[in-house]
Amino acid sequence: MTILSDVKALGQQIWLDNLSRSLVQSGELAQMLKQGVCGVTSNPAIFQKAFAGDALYADEVAALKRQNLSPKQRYETMAVADVRAACDVCLAEHESTGGKTGFVSLEVSPELAKDAQGTVEEARRLHAAIARKNAMIKVPATDAGIDALETLVSDGISVNLTLLFSRAQTLKAYAAYARGIAKRLAAGQSVAHIQVVASFFISRVDSALDATLPDRLKGKTAIALAKAAYQDWEQYFTAPEFAALEAQGANRVQLLWASTGVKNPAYPDTLYVDSLIGVHTVNTVPDATLKAFIDHGTAKATLTESADEARARLAEIAALGIDVETLAARLQEDGLKQFEEAFEKLLAPLV
């Protein structure tokens, strides 16, 4: 048993927040799955880094540039191939759990963040292009993205709803998911294969707030917010309204902790993994955090510990005049901008 297997036994999946051709072709990803990794996430920044630093793309980039394709089409050709290959590596994991684990995420273009219909169309196209049952399409959790989530779920597509910082927005996402499931059931279609994760970002919250907080609260907000979001999750998915859908085969949305590498070197490097282990959750971790957790992390069900203390911390923060929902909206906008910039950098060498 590895520590990752111990975490899985506690009800949480650990995913790798990284993807590149070398990672797949070297067998490194397969080795990580043997250690207990259960899935993979990607984003424009990850692909930008991969394309720039992985020599295995050079020949394909040159060949694609000779074809009459747009830079975005060239990017998608390579990204879809990588996600498909990663899906194949993760397929045995996916099948061993009846389709509950082993997913690989590919994100829609950041420029579609405020365009619900455009998001739906691109998500459908990418899902068809990957053509793997363990592919997950990543959609930003803007109002438009949440509208798209409802449609995509009713289409039977698994979704990673990303860039969540707000508990209120997360609850809106659960309701959209439930509506999508209800539509699909009303049409007499199966829902058992549909998995949705709600990616709630952690370290960026502390990075944004710590400078304004007294020492006793530094590095505490993100974990307190995540614990409160998990309580919201428990209330929503144990309520009779969702139980009726669950009885017809619907899965619960899983909270996925994202941005769990520490940004402040003063904090323990496994802080945002050790502190957020709980049932029906996922933590997607960058390579360095994964290695650190395997080396010296702690597998213990911590997510439901000190819930009263978490609420008290959030109350203290509110008493200081800090509105975490206003902060959440700003952080989501910042995150969208970062992905747009990464996408532009990604496409520039493909012109």
UniProtKB/Swiss-Prot annotation:
Enzyme class per UniProt: transferase
EC numbers on record: 2.2.1.2
Short name of one Pfam family: TAL_FSA
Lineage: superkingdom: Bacteria
GO biological process terms on file: carbohydrate metabolic process; pentose-phosphate shunt
Catalysed reaction equations from the record: D-sedoheptulose 7-phosphate + D-glyceraldehyde 3-phosphate = D-erythrose 4-phosphate + beta-D-fructose 6-phosphate
Summary of the function given for this chain in its UniProt record: Transaldolase is important for the balance of metabolites in the pentose-phosphate pathway.
PANTHER family: TRANSALDOLASE
Designated name of the protein: Transaldolase
Lineage: Bacteria, Pseudomonadati, Pseudomonadota, Betaproteobacteria, Neisseriales
